[in-house]
UniProtKB/Swiss-Prot annotation:
It comes from Salmonella typhimurium (strain LT2 / SGSC1412 / ATCC 700720). Keywords: DNA damage, DNA repair. Residues 366-381 have a biased composition (Low complexity). Residues 382-392 have a biased composition (Gly residues). One of its GO terms (biological process) is mismatch repair. SUPFAM superfamilies: ATPase domain of HSP90 chaperone/DNA topoisomerase II/histidine kinase, DNA mismatch repair protein MutL, Ribosomal protein S5 domain 2-like. Residues 366-403 are annotated as: Disordered. SMART domains: DNA_mis_repair, MutL_C. One of its GO terms (cellular component) is mismatch repair complex. The gene is mutL. GO terms for molecular function: ATP binding; ATP hydrolysis activity; ATP-dependent DNA damage sensor activity; mismatched DNA binding. Pfam families: DNA_mis_repair, HATPase_c_3, MutL_C. This is DNA mismatch repair protein MutL. Gene3D superfamilies: 3.30.230.10, Histidine kinase-like ATPase, C-terminal domain (3.30.565.10), MutL, C-terminal domain, dimerisation subdomain (3.30.1540.20), MutL, C-terminal domain, regulatory subdomain (3.30.1370.100).
Length: 618
């Protein structure tokens, strides 16, 4: 058989194999078109489970007369116009093939009118070449689509349709999902002339919960925990059923939406399941209705023929964000309120969060300043006249006692500046200018070695080895523990009994290294890590660290810091001159012993005399 171009109708029927799976698929595509057109009311009329008639009527913006023929053509759409639009899709439809595909396997009629037009127009396609005929019609502003005799010209597809009741149940489920996605739209569903579902548009939270109960049932509404979780461009809201009271009937309620688009995404389901797994039985599933809002540039919706799945550019971030949002709500449900104290405790000192250069991890913290006055004055200040607990005229609730005459002598004494005594001269011998320096960086060799010039000699320094020694110094606690940096999204890992025992045994030492965690029955949650580890792949590093600890019988902070320093990934696969100079400056400041006595593998002298002698003999 020779290669030939397929006729338009046959090409559309092939595309319909992906777009039009059953009558519910037609309803989904057409209702989503109505929502994209700005409709606030959509009426869906079904006959014989959709096999005989599917009629979708909306009050959207309508379609202009000159665009009706294009609306039934393949790859014609008003949703996108460029690659930039495709990479940031905000509409439900965008491919421009739904109407063409549906019209190729049914008798489709499109009637529409815009607010600017005096009359409506009707279009339908027929024949082998799918020629479109347009004629006047009577219709209010909006659009009506009638799909008659679905699969009438493809008997094989029609044979695979189920019973009328089954097909209508699939349509009913689609409308339920859409009703949960768009609370601001009225949806009316009729079957064989009888109104079956009526979801009125709602705006207030209480009304939304009533619609939620009408769709998901009262048992779900009674156990639903509201979620409102946000970070940057990510927002998670909705409801999740309390896992402690989840029944078999509730487990069928699993609705998830990404930017208003209904989804069945395994990554999202896994994150929710992981957050609830400690409270669910082996045969139980979580029940939820969740809405994820994300920057359209960070999600690709064009990865599934029926648009049931999406692909996130930062899937791990999205997974952990959803997991933490659901987990926080479940934890709030189980937490009990702590009794309030009369006097607030002193605020915990948090060290300044800067890029690691070494000094911030080991600097002695200054005394923290009081964030607020205590509820009751700690000192009476002598005879205060009983005014310490009253508000001042300015309205300050905790005004301090004024200047007392009895304290005048004390204040004057404190204000006197003592005469400075001359400091004794230092007897420390002056250091040579090059004694605490590796020398001058000449160039980078091989991507990971620095060629140095020092006191007339040339040396080759391994930058990865120097970086490892620097990391070890940054991770080794000095007079105070290493500053812990809280993780935005804590890392939750499953551990064995031996690993859990090792972690509990080493918990205090890990705390000195800036690694903070909490453990439960079978899991450990990493809450904070030291700053040098913030950019590491903790999904790999932390499990390896736990495995290392489980193999040890005794623990020491130096050994743990050394292991971490050897196993962290370098941030510089290829070193530049600026990066090498910055690294050596940090090493010279934090690891001066490396300059005095370089360890093996760090420095290698370069013998220039042999090369010079070889040149002289030529």
């Amino acid at each position: 058989m020779p290669i030939q171009v397929l006729p338009p109708q046959l090409a559309n029927q092939i595309a319909a194999g992906e777009v039009v799976e059953r009558p519910a698929s037609v309803v989904k595509e057409l209702v989503e078109n109505s929502l994209d057109a700005g409709a606030t009311r959509v009426d869906i009329d079904i006959e014989r489970g959709g096999a005989k008639l599917i009629r979708i009527r909306d009050n959207g913006c309508g379609i202009k007369k000159e665009e009706l023929a294009l609306a039934l053509a393949r790859h014609a759409t008003s949703k996108i116009a460029s690659l930039d639009d495709l990479e940031a899709i905000i509409s439900l439809g965008f491919r421009g093939e739904a109407l063409a595909s549906i019209s190729s396997v049914s008798r489709l009629t499109l009637t529409s009118r815009t607010a600017e037009q005096a009359e409506a127009w009707q279009a339908y396609a027929e024949g082998r070449d799918m020629d479109v005929t347009v004629k006047p019609a009577a219709h209010p502003v909006g659009t009506t689509l009638e799909v008659l005799d679905l699969f009438y010209n493809t008997p094989a597809r029609r044979k695979f349709m189920r019973t009328e009741k089954t097909e209508f149940n699939h349509i009913d489920e689609i409308i339920r999902r859409i009703a949960l996605a768009r609370f601001d739209v009225t949806l009316n569903l009729s079957h064989n002339g009888k109104l079956v579902r009526q979801y009125r548009a709602v705006a207030k939270d209480g009304q939304k919960e009533r619609r939620l109960g009408a769709i998901c049932g009262t048992p779900f509404l009674e156990q639903a925990l509201a979620i409102e979780w946000q970070h940057g461009d990510l927002t998670l809201r909705g409801w999740v059923a309390d896992p402690n009271h989840t029944t078999t009937a509730l487990t069928e309620i699993q609705y998830c939406y990404v930017n208003g688009r209904m989804m069945r995404d395994r990554l999202i389901n896994h994150a929710i399941r992981q957050a609830c797994e400690d409270k669910l039985g082996a045969d139980q599933q979580p029940a939820f209705v969740l809405y994820l809002e994300i920057d359209p540039h960070q999600v690709d919706v064009n990865v599934h023929p029926a648009k049931h799945e999406v692909r996130f550019h930062q899937s791990r971030l999205v997974h952990d964000f959803i997991y933490q949002g659901v987990l926080s709500v479940l934890q709030q449900q189980t937490e009990t309120a702590l009794p309030l104290e009369e006097i607030a405790p002193a605020p915990r000192h948090v060290q300044e969060n800067r890029i690691a250069a070494g000094r911030n991890h080991f600097a002695v913290p200054a005394e923290p300043t009081a964030a607020r006055e205590p509820a009751t004055p700690r000192y009476s200040g002598g005879a205060s006249g009983g005014n310490g607990g009253r508000q001042s005229a300015g309205g300050w609730p905790h005004a301090q006692p004024g200047y007392q005459k009895q304290q005048g002598e004390v204040y004057r004494t404190l204000l006197q500046t003592p005469t400075a005594s001359p400091a004794p001269e230092s007897v420390t011998p002056a250091l040579d200018g090059h004694s605490q320096s590796f020398g001058r960086v000449l160039t980078i060799v091989g991507g990971d070695c620095a060629l140095l010039e020092h006191a007339g000699t040339i040396q080759l320094l391994s930058l990865p080895v120097a970086e490892r020694w620097l990391r070890q110094a940054q991770l080794t606690p000095g007079q105070s523990p290493v500053c812990a940096q809280p993780l935005l999204i804590p890392l939750r890992l499953k551990v064995s009994a031996d690993e859990k025992a090792a972690l509990q045994k080493a918990q205090s030492l890990l705390g000195e290294l800036g690694i903070e965690f909490q453990s439960d029955a079978q899991h450990v949650t990493i809450r904070a890590v030291p700053l040098p580890l913030r950019q590491q792949n903790l999904q790999i590093l932390i499990p390896e660290l736990i495995g290392y600890l489980a193999q040890q019988t005794t623990f020491a902070t130096v050994n743990i810091a050394q292991w971490i320093a050897r196993n962290v990934q370098s941030e510089h696969p290829q070193w530049s001159m600026a990066q090498a100079i910055s690294l050596l400056a940090d090493v010279e400041r934090l690891c001066p012993q490396l300059v005095k006595a370089p360890p093996g593998g760090l420095l290698q002298p370069v013998d220039l005399h042999s090369a010079m002698n070889a040149l002289k003999h030529e």
